[in-house]
Amino acid sequence: ELGGECLDSPGLDLLAVFIGSEGMLGIVTEVTVKLIPKPATARVIMASFDDVVTGGNAVANVIAAGIIPAGLEMMDQTSSRMVEPFVKAGYDIDAAAILLCEADGTHEEVEEEIARMTAVLEGAGASAIAVSQSEAERMKFWSGRKNAFPAAGRISPDYYCMDGTIPRKKLAEVLTGIAGMETTHGLRCANVFHAGDGNLHPLILFDANKPGEFERAEAFGADILALCVAVGGTITGEHGVGMEKINSMCVQF
């Protein structure tokens, strides 16, 4: 039995080691979880940026300010142009990047955090900022990010989703690198990611019916993962290794 009634226990964190082993150290037969009350309220900021470098740096600024948003997600222009006709979330399709920052908790906590995040984003160079004024508008802002994957199917026969994770301060550098790879491999890439923890989900768009495109998509994905490792990151943050990333393990180790 690992863990306990406290979220963190003193000494070695064997619970994290066991979970992180992904089944190599044993099989979980029973899980005990703690239920917490649903936050009383939540609001989200939608910030637009004129370039991905500024947007990436804004993410680092939010975290550096000691703010821990309930949600911190980012989409590049390819992604916002992909989803806006599909869900009409109100995204600025001329913006190079869209950042969604959510605060939840009591009314007073949310208002304070929204004010702090707004100040940080304005200082980081956001070209436009909108704050949800109702639950319906909050869900509308989020609808674009949540529908990024099905929206990709509207503009491309196939897509290849990656799962690299990088230090947040390297977001701008990696996004710039991925843009260069689009030219190298001759394929488009829509970037959507969990900006708060640096977990990238680039969607490489291709057509498997065209000879060579699948192989180019695989090579593109391998290059993205190699870049993630080069900047101090890892080849997977959520999806695991499996068969898909087995060759990239040699890059990681």
Predicted regions mapped to residue ranges:
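Phosphate/diphosphate-binding loops
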Residues: G3, D51, D92-G105
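FAD-binding subdomain of flavoenzyme oxidoreductases
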Residues: E1-E73
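Conserved glycine-rich FAD pyrophosphate-binding loop
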Residues: M75-Q77, P85-I98, V110-F253
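Short loop segments at secondary-structure junctions
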Residues: E22, D104-T106, A208-N209
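Solvent-exposed beta-strand/loop surfaces of large extracellular or lumenal domains
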Residues: G71, R81-V83
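Short N-terminal helix-initiation segments at or just after the protein's N-terminus
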Residues: L35-F49, L99-D104, E137-R145
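Glycine-rich beta-alpha junction loops
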Residues: L35, D51, D76-S79, A103-H107, ...
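Preference for bulky hydrophobic residues occupying beta-strand positions
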Residues: V31-V33, A47, C101, G164, ...
